[in-house]
Amino acid sequence: MKYESGRSMVEMIGVLAIMGVITAGAILLINVGLNSSKRRSVDDEVTMLVTGIRDSFSGYDDFSGIGNVNVFTMTGVSQQNPYGGTYGVAVDPSNPRQFIVSINGLSQSECEALKVRTWPGSIGYEMSGHKESGATGTCTNPNGENVVQITFGE
């Protein structure tokens, strides 16, 4: 009987398959972590924007002057969001006592995730008794072209 030393090809293929599964799992976990981090960043930045705008306009009857002020310089928040798009801030055309924060340049999945997230202090969230997100958005456009809008104010 002849004894062989080393590994057979089947054993090596098995080891490579196991390594492939481990690598794919690690990549998936890293991706989930990055997405979670981006969502937290958006949450923090929108909160800073809203707080800064409310503080700056607290002495006024409405937010109609928001178009004349660079809110990003005023609040210290970058206009670019973590997804490569931009934030936008504008007075609600139907009610100058409200303003709209838009998050532009989202993929479809990120758009859906941010649209259903609860946005405390937003108009839709307050009026629904804290049962709905308070955000609206169109999430059917190609990736990078979706927008979520959140209305704040009275």
Predicted regions and their residues:
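Short, functional N-terminal and low-complexity linear motifs
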Residues: 13-20, 39-40, 77-83
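Membrane-proximal N-terminal amphipathic helix
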Residues: 28-65
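Short N-terminal micro-motifs specific to bacterial/archaeal maturation
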Residues: 3, 21, 40, 102-105
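Periplasmic/extracellular, small/polar-rich flexible segments of pilin-like filament-forming proteins
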Residues: 55-154
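N-terminal single-pass transmembrane signal-anchor helix
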Residues: 1-34
